[in-house]
């Protein structure tokens, strides 16, 4: 059985999905068009939806940081956070991440903690899988798990809906060691001010 913690936040106070719909110019995130090709590790972050999200990250960042404060509370001063959250779109007929993986296999520190934030319903085969188990979640829930050391990924989305989510990582400040490794998603060095930040 997968090990994770389920947290909740008030979507009226932290309206992430509304903001993402606005910056993407899409009314229905679950209705995003089905993919005509399966994503790979090289292409899973390069859709037009991703470009719109990352082009507007300055608009999303204040609400993202509010969410981090709500989730971490007093612990916020003991960790660094991922400066730019990772955006995921699991279109129908596709796989949102190119392969099953543990984040440590791609240069991430083994003491990082992952926070997965669905912005739509996540169920069936459109959801995140952790240790071979689908993790069902709703908008307003956050799944916290050990992504550095747990196998996680996606399967082909054969549901009727696309899943949109974002995720971010935290790192205990005591574990931070500057290095030249870079993130797979957008090539940022795992350094404070680049991949990592304070809240």
UniProtKB/Swiss-Prot annotation:
Keyword Transmembrane: no
Pathway involvement of the protein, from the record: Antibiotic biosynthesis; streptomycin biosynthesis
Name assigned to this protein: Streptomycin biosynthesis protein StrG
Highest taxon in the source lineage: Bacteria
Keywords (A to Z) from UniProt: Antibiotic biosynthesis, Streptomycin biosynthesis
Keyword Methyltransferase listed: no
Gene3D superfamilies in alphabetical order: q2cbj1_9rhob like domain (2.60.120.620)
One example of a Gene Ontology biological process annotation: streptomycin biosynthetic process
Role this protein plays: May be involved in the formation of N-methyl-L-glucosamine.
């Amino acid at each position: 059985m997968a090990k994770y913690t389920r947290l909740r936040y008030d979507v009226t106070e932290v309206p992430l999905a509304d903001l993402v719909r606005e910056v993407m110019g899409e009314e229905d995130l679950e209705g995003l068009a089905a993919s005509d090709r399966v994503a790979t590790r090289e292409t899973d972050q390069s859709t037009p939806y991703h470009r719109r999200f990352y082009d507007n990250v300055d608009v999303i960042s204040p609400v993202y940081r509010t969410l981090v404060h709500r989730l971490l509370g007093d612990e916020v001063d003991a960790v660094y956070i991922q400066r730019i959250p990772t955006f995921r779109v699991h279109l129908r007929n596709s796989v949102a991440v190119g392969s099953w993986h543990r984040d440590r296999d791609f240069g991430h520190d083994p003491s990082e903690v992952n926070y997965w934030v669905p912005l739509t319903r996540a169920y069936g085969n459109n959801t995140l899988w952790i240790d071979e188990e689908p993790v069902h979640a709703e908008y307003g829930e956050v799944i916290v798990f050990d992504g550095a050391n747990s196998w996680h990924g996606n399967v082909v989305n054969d549901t009727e809906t696309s899943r949109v989510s974002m995720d971010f990582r935290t790192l205990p400040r005591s574990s931070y060691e500057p290095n030249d490794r870079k993130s797979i998603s957008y090539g940022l060095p795992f350094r404070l001010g680049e991949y990592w930040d304070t809240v």
